[in-house]
Amino acid sequence: MSDQKTQHLPTAIFVMGPTASGKTALSVALRQHLPVELISVDSALIYRGMDIGTAKPTTEEQALAPHRLINILDPSQPYSAADFCHDALKEMAEITASGRIPLLVGGTMLYFKALLEGLSPLPSANPVIRAQIEQQAAEQGWDALHQQLQKIDPAAALRIHPNDPQRLSRALEVFLISGKTLTELTTLSGESLPYRVHQFAIAPAKRELLHQRIEARFHQMLESGFEEEVKALYARHDLHVDLPSIRCVGYRQMWSYLSGEIDYDEMIYRGICATRQLAKRQITWLRGWKSVHWLDSSQPEQALSTVMQVVSA
């Protein structure tokens, strides 16, 4: 939407960025300076009992700046981009009605995109077809399915990594159900967000610094009891590695360690690598984002000042 068209709309703020980039710290600081209420945009923070491995805001941070849409589901429950849009729009309306500004913070870019552009008319999940895809993957490997996707939907195959079974499975499922590719259907997006949105992306200017932060944070999680947290989940009979909650970065690798598939050092190595890959994907998404103000997380005071100036303009 053009500035002229959005002038009469209520304001919203997006704080986006890769994992370990300082999004929470910036949002908590903004809460001290602006009349904002925070909404989490994170597909892992929605789950209860998954606090350490998701780097959930601390008790102190939550006291300073309560986050909505955190701890709303059990790890056994599914949650889609459509579910998020429904919940986020409701929270945003409540915040706006109270005379405050919704500040949406997180790293799940698909949720931000769905909220901004509206959801595409994608078919609902089909358990039978999904099971067939999982069976084929078990027999042939996900690389073979990725090659299949390249023939069906080359554009989606470029976006989706062979090591991302959740998105790969969904792309194939959509085609098998509808006869149309994911790329075709995602061009038919819904209504745009009825807010004047100020979008910010925060990340260190140097990639090496982000890598160092990710490694340090993973070790800090282990020292804080991450293994014990996942052991409690592993002991439950209703949770398994194919659930979105257990597929979360860090949890999947710890699960493999607890099941005896890999040793402790390999778990650490894979956990850090997977987190770096996630950060790379998040940055790639953001580089293609329109109308975003980039902030350097290694200069938090300057980042805060930039947001204040843009929002107040």
Swiss-Prot record:
Pfam families: IPPT. GO terms for molecular function: ATP binding; tRNA dimethylallyltransferase activity. Residues 42-45, 166-170, 247-252, 280-287 are annotated as: Interaction with substrate tRNA. Gene3D superfamilies: 1.10.20.140, P-loop containing nucleotide triphosphate hydrolases. Its cofactor is Mg(2+). ATP binds at G17, P18, T19, A20, S21, G22, K23, T24. The record marks T108, R130 as: Interaction with substrate tRNA. It catalyses: adenosine(37) in tRNA + dimethylallyl diphosphate = N(6)-dimethylallyladenosine(37) in tRNA + diphosphate. Coiled coil: none annotated. Its EC number is 2.5.1.75. Keywords: ATP-binding, Magnesium, Nucleotide-binding, Transferase, tRNA processing. Substrate binds at T19, A20, S21, G22, K23, T24. GO terms for biological process: tRNA modification. Belongs to the IPP transferase family. Catalyzes the transfer of a dimethylallyl group onto the adenine at position 37 in tRNAs that read codons beginning with uridine, leading to the formation of N6-(dimethylallyl)adenosine (i(6)A). Monomer. HAMAP family: IPP_trans. This is tRNA dimethylallyltransferase. It comes from Photorhabdus laumondii subsp. laumondii (strain DSM 15139 / CIP 105565 / TT01) (Photorhabdus luminescens subsp. laumondii).
